Every structure is written in structure tokens, then in C-alpha cells.
Amino acid sequence: IYTLSLHDALPISSLYYLGKVDEAKKIQQIRSAMRAYDEENVFTTHRGMILVERQIGHATRYGLMAAIDLEAYDYTRASTSWIRATEGTVAERIPPRMKIREGAPLELPHILVLVDDTEKLLIEPLVAIRDTLPVVYDFDLMMGSGHIRGYSLADGEIERRVLAAIDRLQSDETLAKKYGPLNERNRILFAIGDGNHSLATAKEIWEKNKKTWGPDHPARYAMVELENLHDAAQEFEPIHRIVLGLSGSLKNALADEFGGTVSFEPFANREALFAAVDATKDGVQSFGLIEDGEFVKVTFAEPRSALCVGSVQQFLDQLRKAGFFKEVDYLHGTEELSALSDVKGNAGIYLPPVQKNGFFEGIIKDGALPRKTFSMGEAQEKRFYIEARRIL
């Protein structure tokens, strides 16, 4: 699998070097390798969906490999499609990826798509019968990344059950129960958790060629792994902010902007502050502010976004436009956040874990979540390039 990926894919870091003299040569090598592997039967062909079991440390995460219809996907912020982006899509990142995908006979996806399945209708019933299913692959992953196993779902009755579950998730009754009175914004089924720019690339290529290819062409669809947002092993890590080069007090700027709708609670140290923010109740938006040696829990009484990170980011964007600070950096851990917050003229923003119950509501209300809202696990928990699908 490792060798196949190196020959059949271009590492994301290499995208920034496209335009150099070896660009066409490298892309041609990828296409040639794909065709050779296909013609020489390097791949084992399977039809139908696959149940994926990924063991990572103490947890086991499940997913459903399937193909989604790109006609039902729109990555723009104003999207009202059934399938939407979670974060804003950077248009400039799409053309380099199009150069690679266009003309490629295969796709090797790493795309993770989330479903807001609180009743566990779609994937969990498949997990319950996995011991009766044929195993497609079963092996350890490299560099401490755990173990992966795939089960074939190429059975007519199982496929009917999957489609019935999707129909129920799309039903007016289910949607109204989760999101309130129906409108064009809250008719949503899937949200892209990881790999949105890759999926946006597939969408653009399909839109460019669909009149020539026709509605039944395989490139109308893109293979992804569907995962339940409410899987206990699906962990969303918050991404904190460090505000650099402030021209004034961030705490005072918050008070000026929000007035009586924001409150400040001081703590003796950063550990107590972090614990208090982590313990924030569902439906309440609070974050930690570290500035000038103070440790303050900030709470919005009238939040301006569905998620706390959205309310914070909107405020920071306003201040950036006003020239109130030099830049914002995004940090995953607390050690660097703490160290940088101690520098004069900086302020650290410690964000709470993303509340799963408000995740889809954030997409519905705001169109897309703010950049750097969350991280889906550590590096060794990311999806590997394992499955391929013919698209030309």
C-alpha cells in the first residue's frame, strides 16, 4: 500500500511546487503508474461498499466506504445542498489539484465525510453484523498508526438497509427533530470533515466535463469514508489562537464590543482556567483568555455564531481589519499557547472542545465553520490511502 501511494499520488507538500519544470513529467508518471497497476492486476477488485474498522490506541472507529454524488455537493458558503463543506474552501488551492486529477484513471481518496446520526441508524447496524461479513483487508498500519480491517458489504439486502437508513436520515421528520422547522438551509445530510479541497477538485472536474461525459459517468461520483459524528472514537480537538502584536488590551476590546453581553471570570492560574473552559455546559459559549499575566474565562450571553470558535473568530476578524493586532496564529497544544501568551503584546485564546451537538447547526447557521475550527485526531489517526476507484 505504501509503494502504491508513492507512485499513485503526489504528496500535499508537493502541490506548492507545481509549476516547476518537472510538473508535467511527475503527473504523467502518476497516470502511467495507475494504468500499469490496473492493467497488471496489482489491485484486487471489489464491488460494493466496505465497512472500515480502524483501531487507534485504546479506541476503535468505524466508517463506511461509499461513493457520493457530486451533483448533491456544493462547497460554497451559501450552499443549501445535501452535502456541504465544514470550513471555507480556498479557491486558489483547487487548480493545482485539478492538474493532477484530470486524466488520472483512478482516484485514491482520503476524504472523511461526517453524518449527524444521533440515532446511529447508518453505520452502527453494520458494525453489529461485522463478524458475519467477508474480510476485504486486514493489516497493521505503519508508524504506530494502529490497525485497519475492511468488510465487504456487497450484498443486496445489506445495501437496501443502508439506503433505507439514508432515506430516514434525509426525511423531514428526522431533520425537523434535529434542526427545527424545515427550510432550505437545514436540509443537510453530510458534511466534509477532512479532504474538502480534494472533493472540491473532483466537483470542478465533473462540472467542467459532465456535458461531454453524460450523467452516468463514474467521475460524477467520488469515493469517501462516511463516519458518524457521534462515534465515541471520533474526537475533535480544538485549535487555539495566539494573537500577536496587539496595540491594546484584548479584554478591553471585548468589553467595548459586547458590552453587558460578555462576562469575565478570573482564575488563579492557567490550569484552573483550562479546566473551567473544558467544563463549559452544552449551549454555553466560553473561552479562556491569557493576557498580561491574567487568566480569564470569557462567556458570551448573546453569541454571534452557533459555535464558540465562530463567535471568537468573527470578533478577531473585525479587529484584524481595524489593525488592532499584527496576526493570529493557530495552535493545537497548550504548552506553546502558554509560552507565547507570556510575551508582552500577545494574548492567548484557549478554546473549548467542539460540541458535537452544535456542529451541524454551525454549518447551517453560518454557511461554513471558521477556518481552523477543529482537528480530527492526531497525525497517526488520519486516513491512509488504501482503496482506489476507477473514474476514467
What do these predicted regions represent?
Residues 1-9, 23-31, 284-392:
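Long, compositionally biased intrinsically disordered regions
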Residues 168-212:
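Active-site beta-strand/loop microenvironment that shapes enzyme catalytic pockets
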Residues 1-146, 150, 154, 176-180, ...:
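N-terminal extension/subdomain marker
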Residues 42, 53-57, 98-106, 181-184, ...:
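A general structural signal for short secondary-structure junctions and capping/turn motifs
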Residues 165, 169-173, 271-280, 329-344:
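A short, acidic, amphipathic alpha-helical segment used as a generic capping/interface helix at domain edges
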Residues 194-257:
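Catalytic or ion-translocation cores adjacent to nucleophile or general acid/base/metal-coordination motifs
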Residues 142-165, 300, 304:
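Glycine-rich phosphate-binding "P-loop"
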Residues 231-296:
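C-terminal amphipathic alpha-helical segment
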